[in-house]
């Protein structure tokens, strides 16, 4: 028996002493305010106080807190409450997933240094990452914790800052995807491809499903509807559960549902992999004779977009100055702190799925098609989103949750690990961009030519939007009389590329502004 004080109250737990403190708090004690972002001590979302000092709860075995004092964001301590009110006053919680950790780090500092400098606040928050805010309002809230609330300068909304409608929930650490699930929910674990391109075959799934603690095994053969989804319906091409072959590392090919309280260990799952030739770069994918990822897309091209205005070739031939340039950008991970998470259950004949999402109506339509349900028999409840930045516009675990609840009649839940989230979700499109820009003798732009090749990965996602939007925006905010701009999205066996704040325009802007700078230097501006 492990005994300790939690927020001033005695707690007694019969747990393996190596159990993470985060698991003990969240799963055994139901204290969901402490968040799990990485399970590796990197993000600090799980920061709690242990004997008055901040620690990452994901790195602390529960056996090490025996006889000690643990304080979490649920603590009734007056100074913590005061700091929460300061966070609300300053609007310091944006997505909110890091807020409980920030509050604990802030309280730790304020108890040692009641009137800290900004530099001291920055140092105290060094172990807690925030992906959204830039830290300004968080720092201000801690520095101004004792500041009296400023009264409104006018009646109504005009002239005053309005409190966030969801602010209280965010400072309490409530309402995220991993925080709620019906009692007795099955826990889902995904079987994912360890290869960028591989054929696979299953062994004796029935024998595996008969193992103690396993409630069921599910593959593409169990999907009752159309095993395809996509953010843009005419381009839908991604299976909820892949049929051989898997087209990218991290693709889900099967699900295992475990009974509650069971260790969701998929070791020994009966599957055999046969690695196949992988097309990693767009150049490889467009090479003559390269195998197609999708039979209906020659040269592995998803789509091409273009904008043509005037006669750019002639204008550049006549231009006083011309600069050519080539640039490459890489995949970029969205790096939200909250991994994908959600739960599903039946309610009065309606399948209910609660998950972190940026697009609940799109989720409903895509998931209903996969599960063969009319839209009025499926409800999507969006939880708070602990960072999204475009990636959570795409469906992730919603069809998986729905499938298991439909097949078993039981509620279920699923929480991606950090590694799963980074492997299986969308990224910013890598780009290869070439072109030239010309101006007259006075430096006035006369023409632009641009060709962009964007690595859209194994499936379409938002690739069509990127390929069509880039040619429209590549000339930037500058008057350009003659433009020829083309972009194409190319399939590879890399991660799926999707929406990420700008739909390809930031990549094009890097190229464009660099060329403009070089052109300005040449002209002497």
Which sequence ranges carry the predicted segments?
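Acidic, glycine-rich active-site loops and adjacent beta-strand->loop/helix elements
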Residues: 64, 76, 223, 357-360, ...
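Alpha-helical support elements that line or immediately flank enzyme active sites
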Residues: 102, 111, 189-220, 254-273, ...
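Glycine-rich loop/linker segments at domain edges
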Residues: 91, 160, 166-172, 300-342, ...
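Signature of N-terminal electron-transfer/Fe-S-associated modules in redox systems
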Residues: 1-157
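Glycine-rich and small/hydrophobic secondary-structure elements
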Residues: 142-143, 155, 172, 234-258, ...
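Flexible, low-hydrophobicity surface segments
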Residues: 146-303
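Beta-strand segments within the central parallel beta-sheet cores of soluble alpha/beta enzyme folds
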Residues: 37-40, 119-126, 376-383, 409-419, ...
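Short Pro/Gly-enriched beta-strand edge/turn motifs at strand-loop
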Residues: 27-30, 226-228, 317-332, 414-421
């Amino acid at each position: 028996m492990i005994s300790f004080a939690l927020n001033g109250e005695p707690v007694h737990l019969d747990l393996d002493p190596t159990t993470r403190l985060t698991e003990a708090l969240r799963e055994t004690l139901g204290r969901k305010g402490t968040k799990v972002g990485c399970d590796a001590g990197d993000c600090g979302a799980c920061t709690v106080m242990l004997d008055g000092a901040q620690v990452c709860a994901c790195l602390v075995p529960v056996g090490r807190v025996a006889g000690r004092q643990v304080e979490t964001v649920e603590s009734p301590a007056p100074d913590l409450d005061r700091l929460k009110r300061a966070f609300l006053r300053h609007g310091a919680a944006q997505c909110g997933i890091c807020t409980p950790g920030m509050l604990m780090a802030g309280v730790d500092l304020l108890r040692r240094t009641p009137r800290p400098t900004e530099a001291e606040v920055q140092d105290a928050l060094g172990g807690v990452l925030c992906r959204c805010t830039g830290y300004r309002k968080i720092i201000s809230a801690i520095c101004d914790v004792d500041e009296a609330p400023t009264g409104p300068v006018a009646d109504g909304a005009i002239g005053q800052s309005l409190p966030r409608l969801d602010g209280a929930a965010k400072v309490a650490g409530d309402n995220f995807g991993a925080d709620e699930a019906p009692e007795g929910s099955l826990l889902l674990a995904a079987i994912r491809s360890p290869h960028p391109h591989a054929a696979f075959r299953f062994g004796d799934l029935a024998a595996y499903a008969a193992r103690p603690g396993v409630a069921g095994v599910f593959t593409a053969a169990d999907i009752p509807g159309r095993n395809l989804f996509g953010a843009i319906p005419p381009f839908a091409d991604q299976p909820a559960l892949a049929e051989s072959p898997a087209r990218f590392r991290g693709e889900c090919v099967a699900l295992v549902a475990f009974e509650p309280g069971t260790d969701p260990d998929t070791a020994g799952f009966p599957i055999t992999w046969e690695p196949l030739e992988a097309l990693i770069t767009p150049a490889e994918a467009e090479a003559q004779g390269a195998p197609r990822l999708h039979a209906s897309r020659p040269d592995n091209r998803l789509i091409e977009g273009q904008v043509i205005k005037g006669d750019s070739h002639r204008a550049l031939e006549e231009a006083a100055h011309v600069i050519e340039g080539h640039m490459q950008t890489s995949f970029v991970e969205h790096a939200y702190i909250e991994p994908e998470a959600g739960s599903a259950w039946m309610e009065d004949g309606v399948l209910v799925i609660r998950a972190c999402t940026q697009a609940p109506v799109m989720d409903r339509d895509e998931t209903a098609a996969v599960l063969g349900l009319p839209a009025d028999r499926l409800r999507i409840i969006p939880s708070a989103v602990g960072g999204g930045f475009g990636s959570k516009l795409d469906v992730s675990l919603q069809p998986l949750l729905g499938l298991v609840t439909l097949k078993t009649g039981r509620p279920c839940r699923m929480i991606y690990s950090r590694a799963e989230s980074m492997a299986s979700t969308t990224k910013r499109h890598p780009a290869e961009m070439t072109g030239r820009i010309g101006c007259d003798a006075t430096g006035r732009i006369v023409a632009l030519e641009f060709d962009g090749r964007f690595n859209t990965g194994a499936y379409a996602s938002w690739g069509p939007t990127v390929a069509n939007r880039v040619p429209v925006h590549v000339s930037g905010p500058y008057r350009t009389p003659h433009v020829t701009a083309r972009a194409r999205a190319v399939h590879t066996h890399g991660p799926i590329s999707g929406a990420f704040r700008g739909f390809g325009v930031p990549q094009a802007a890097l190229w464009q502004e660099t060329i403009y700078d070089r052109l300005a230097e040449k002209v002497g501006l």
